[in-house]
Amino acid sequence: MAAENRDVFVNCPFDTDYRPLFNAIVFTIIRSGFRARCALEADNAAENRFDKICKIVSECRYGVHDISRTEVDGNPPLPRFNMPLELGLFLGAKKYGGARHREKSCIIFDREQYRFQRYISDIAGQDIHAHRGEPASLIVELAAWLRIHSGDAQVPGGVAIGNEFIAFEEALPAIYAARQLDPGEVTFGDYNAVVVQYLTA
């Protein structure tokens, strides 16, 4: 895999409750000089979701995986296995995908460091990072990981990025208003573009 690949696959919930953490992940990735990728980046009805995810995984050197939302949900109550499945795809690509995938690296988040052992014990050898549901904690962990695993000393510290993220969130309503975007209709592409514009202004 080419050294210049700075694409980061984001595997996490996309619901409203998780949105603060998702936004923190995307902001941190972009602020650190990388490109955030996820299944929301393209709306193509001719391409099924699994194929789209496989394509993105194939193209990304790095991965951010949050397995904190595997609890039962809905009626009937069933567990949510999308995130563990996509984590498995990423780890499988690294192990079996050939030479260009061997440099893949990922960080795994959960609410608590050892909670995952109760439902996905096969990854017990992995280093799980706890965010406790707090964007600030996630940003600190993610920024340090990106800096270490990319070898890029220009990636800022997580506390500094966290402060920038707070300022960005405060400015966001005015930014959306200027772009004539209702917060409820903002797509992943819109949010990416807004973050890039804010950071490069």
Q: What are the residue ranges of the model-derived segments?
A:
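Short glycine-/polar-rich loops that comprise or flank the Walker A/P-loop
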Residues: 6, 60-61, 102-105, 124-126
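Short glycine-enriched loops at secondary-structure junctions
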Residues: 14-16, 109-115, 134
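Arginine/glycine-rich "motif VI" loop of SF2 helicases in the C-terminal RecA-like domain
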Residues: 31, 92-103
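Conserved TIR/SEFIR loop-to-helix hotspot centered on a Trp-containing motif
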Residues: 69-96
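C-terminal interaction surface of TIR/SEFIR-family domains
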Residues: 117-201
